Amino acid sequence: MKMKLSFRWYGEDDPISLQYISQIPGMRSIVSAVYDVKPGEVWSEESIKKLKDDCDKNGLVFDVVESIPVHEDIKLGRGDVDKLLDVYCENIRRCAKYGVKCVTYNFMPVFDWTRTQLDKLADDGSTSLVMYWEQMKGLDPLKDDIHLP
């Protein structure tokens, strides 16, 4: 088995277009997700198909989903967990229908990737995620409805 080159794409708002990604030698696979749906809601087939079609138009394959967000109530074992798990499973089935072969998952306790800023500028001009403790320390995930960037 060979390692497959894949590239993360954040959808139409990503400053790097699929056209640019397709120019990377050996790049065939896109890792993406439906970003405009809250955790615990079903992804529309239209949104998934659009991702696939956009990739196809650029000679790329949308076959990896970077995490269908896990609702906090699943992690905390509260609320209507069975319904939320059904929604999660339905999202997996819908992705499979449109050719997705791999769904990464993130069951990090309480918060997903903990960060407070998505574009921290480094000295070399690159950007990365960053978490500032001062912005996080007053949050209580058991009491507050918290959404990080």
Predicted regions and their residues:
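Active-site mouth loops of central-metabolism enzymes
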Residues: 2-14, 72-86
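Conserved, mostly hydrophobic/aromatic
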Residues: 21, 30-32, 55, 95
